[in-house]
């Protein structure tokens, strides 16, 4: 998990952490296309970023929203214990495993976040 990162990737990581929102054991972070431009990075550079918020003791589910295009997000979900985030991903046409899953949502960020939170809260 801890390899050698470029300065741009580290800058991107800091920007992503600055978007952190926590509520009810759910941590949400967001990556925008502008962040990639500002840090000269690419979507490959966000690999594992979804894992970091889950390190916090009170976080049961970590969700990363990566902007693909206007009003379209790739969602990565990670969970602890018996919380099956694959069910959340499947509700949006995605899939995965119990503790690691993903999907795509065509909506603005606030709408996408609200839709994901409804599904995640139903599991916690």
Q: At which residue positions do the language-model features occur?
A:
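Hydrophobic helix-and-loop "lid/oligomerization" segment in the mid-to-C-terminal part
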Residues: 1-91, 96-124
